[in-house]
Amino acid sequence: MEAISRDAVLFVNIPFVSEERPFTTGHRLVGDRAARMRYLEALRAEARAVAPETRPVVIRAVKVGGGSPSIMSPDKLGELLLDLRALFDLADDCEVSLEAVPHTVGVPSLTGWGQGKVNRVILRADSVQPEELVALDRPFDSVQVQNALLFLDKFHLGNVDVALRYGIPGQTEASLMRTLRSVAGIEPAHLTLEPLLAADEGVLDEEAQRRLYDAACERLSSYGFVQYAPGRFARDELHREEFAVALGQGAALIGLGIDARSCYHGLSYVNTSDFAVYAAHSAEPQHAVAAVAQLDEGARALLFVRNRLAFGGGFAEEDYVRACGPMSAEVARELAELERAGDVAHDGGAYRLTQQGLFAWAR
């Protein structure tokens, strides 16, 4: 098996939201300004503790995500990103991306984020249809989505990923096509399509979501977008999400924050989900880390397969052998099951996700 990757990506989990709303999944925190500031300081403390352990990896991409990280103090977010640049070995062309909700995008926020040299924004628009944003109870409207895009353009931030949802209550193929037409018309560099997986009433079922997904893929192809990984569409290779591309090429994962997951130097880690514990002990792994496990060759081989399918859409057998050695019975079994399910096609010495597989792995 080849040496452990020296490339890595860094994910910073900020699960804060302004208030509890329907149609959300995952761990979310609602806190006042003091709690948010305390969390950002805890992230900086964890980064200082973790960075020396990760060397000699080179960070190809940094992604700040989670709940609504753009509601945090823009200046403090900028300071956090500057800390990460000083503590970790970032590649010269490192992608630094931030998930943002439309109503938080403006001159103050873009100025603060700019201090941290954010060069990619993931705009979580969900939709541009007014009735669908109302159905989702989002704290912004379609006008604010348009304004956010104008501000991003004004600040010459051309690497924008517009994240949209399918499966919204009341959504139809026609309404999704209108959204895609409107968004494609502003010529974003990247589009992300994500299923609405919340258990709230009204969410479209899996069969209906599959129809919407297939129709969206066909329409985006006609607009010149290429789907390079499940739910990820780019006009050209230059604007593919480097965070995903790097994971699909075997980069290690370093996670900071509550619930963060890491996988590097042959070990996997999961951080605590307890805010009080994390805020008080983020710099102390014996308290901040809830679980740790060693990755044997079998686990690393499965991770290779799953990351390359999830973030790269597939892989060549020769790449697998180069990275992991001869295919084990466990890996062969998993791939055979995916083939039988119709999610993976094995052809010409490569395993690739089918259209059905792209839909399944986007979920």
PLM regions: where:
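Short amphipathic alpha-helical interaction segments
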Residues: 325-340
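C-terminal scaffold of the Radical SAM
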Residues: 2-7, 26-53, 57-325
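Extended hydrophobic-aromatic, low-complexity segments
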Residues: 317-318, 329-331, 346
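A short, conserved structural fragment
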Residues: 339-349
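Accessory beta->alpha helical hairpin/"wing" motif in late/C-terminal subdomains of nucleic-acid enzymes
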Residues: 348-363
